[in-house]
Amino acid sequence: MSDIKVAGLEHLQALCAIDQKVIGNSSRSDEIQQAIEEKRCLLHHFADDITGFLISTEDFFGYDFISLVIVKPSARRKGIASALINAYVKTTKSLKVFSSTNQSNTNMQHVFQALGFVKSGIIDNLDDGDPEIIYVKIA
């Protein structure tokens, strides 16, 4: 049975392991821990297996921002990112939810579009040659 819940510190090691598997290093471990401590991290699990997580902030020009959605490579293309985003959007009190992805990440662009997010802008120069596309979902 799959479920989404707020992550606790007991999940930190598993979430960091998934993140490291995806990006190849542990550079975001402190960010993940802080998000867990501040209750800004949702996780998706299937039985006892954590398959993905989402980190959010509430300080994007006064609106909520989904800053990170990570799915374990072996669990991709199964709707986990969509489930995490939908769960977050359903619980937020914000009138607008923003997120972003690189122009090269067409899979995530399709996820946002399928969930009713629309393009809101572009930020150049974060990653050389790969602009960041900002998306918004208006409640």
Locate each region found by the language model:
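A short, internal acetyl-CoA/4′-phosphopantetheine-binding micro-motif in the GNAT/acyltransferase core
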Residues: 68-76, 101-102
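Conserved acetyl-CoA-binding loop-helix of GNAT-fold acetyltransferases
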Residues: 71, 77-90, 110, 114
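Conserved GNAT acetyl-CoA-binding A-motif
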Residues: 91-103
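C-terminal "cap" of GNAT-fold acetyltransferases
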Residues: 125-139
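Acetyl-CoA-dependent GNAT
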Residues: 2, 6-68, 72, 85, ...
